[in-house]
UniProtKB/Swiss-Prot annotation:
This protein's name: Large-conductance mechanosensitive channel
Primary location: membrane
Statement: the UniProt record of this protein carries the keyword Transferase: no
Lineage: Bacteria, Pseudomonadati, Chlorobiota, Chlorobiia, Chlorobiales
PANTHER family given in the database record: LARGE-CONDUCTANCE MECHANOSENSITIVE CHANNEL, MECHANOSENSITIVE CHANNEL MSCL
Membrane-related topology note: Multi-pass membrane protein
InterPro entries referenced in this protein's UniProt entry, alphabetically: Mechanosensitive_channel_CS, MS_channel, MSC/AndL, MscL_channel
Species: Prosthecochloris aestuarii (strain DSM 271 / SK 413)
Assembly behavior: Homopentamer.
Family from the record: Belongs to the MscL family.
Molecular function (Gene Ontology), one example: mechanosensitive monoatomic ion channel activity
Length: 134
């Protein structure tokens, strides 16, 4: 089998295609969550704690001089990224929990009892007749 054919077989397997779709959707979902956090959630939180803009939160490690720029530790952007991560992780948890619940329900569906064979039916009839006699 040629190299190209092996690659096609590998790429067209269900797991690889599912993974690719998941990565694309995950990237898009990450952008949506980042926009939600940056534009919707963090401004009211900043307002509640005294009009703080989280993008500008930083510790200045060294002040700016004429020769060099200031050196600062920008922890506000880090806090926003943590909020992004928590929302994405929680969303993934909820989706996986729902999928597992659906999977369990389909596995728990009661199966019809097996139809007894002719021999089992005959043995049952013999047993019933013996009970009546004895």
């Amino acid at each position: 089998m040629g190299f190209i054919q092996e690659f096609k077989d590998f790429a067209m397997r269900g797991n690889v295609v599912d993974l690719a779709v998941g990565i694309i959707i995950g990237g898009a979902f990450g952008k949506v969550v980042t926009a939600l956090v940056d534009g919707v959630l963090m401004p009211p939180i900043g307002l509640l704690i005294g009009g703080v803009n989280f993008d500008q939160l930083a510790f200045e490690l060294r002040a700016a001089t004429a020769e060099s720029a200031a050196v600062s530790l920008n922890y506000g952007a880090f806090l926003q990224t943590i909020v992004d991560f928590v929302i994405i992780a929680f969303s993934i948890f909820v989706v996986i929990k729902a999928l597992n619940s659906l999977k369990r329900k389909s596995e728990e569906a009661p199966k019809a009892p097996p139809v007894p064979s002719k021999e089992e039916v005959l043995l049952g009839e013999i047993r019933d007749l013996l009970k009546e006699r004895g």
